[in-house]
Amino acid sequence: MDTSGIELKDTSAQHVAVGEDSLTVDLADGRTIAVPLAWFPRLLHATAAERANWRLIGPGEGIHWPDLDEDISVASLLAGRRSNETGESLRRWLDGRKAK
């Protein structure tokens, strides 16, 4: 079944929790999405304080972590998409963290 044309309603994020191993997002329609933190290396390498410092983008369309320069859309979580950051980009980001 092709789901590319399905309109997503009431899928805005309402609450976000980032644990040691998973990212959990509660949606307005009552669902909860949980994905492995390994899907998002910047979150995986972040401190607990950095993970806790998030804000919703727009009316819950996504989540932004200002300390990590990380943005994740609800649509990508629903589609099961992992971070598409390259290994080289992640290495540069990690090296920049060490320099601080």
Regions found by a protein language model. Give the residues of each.
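Motif-centric detector for short Cys/His coordination patterns
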Residues: 1-100
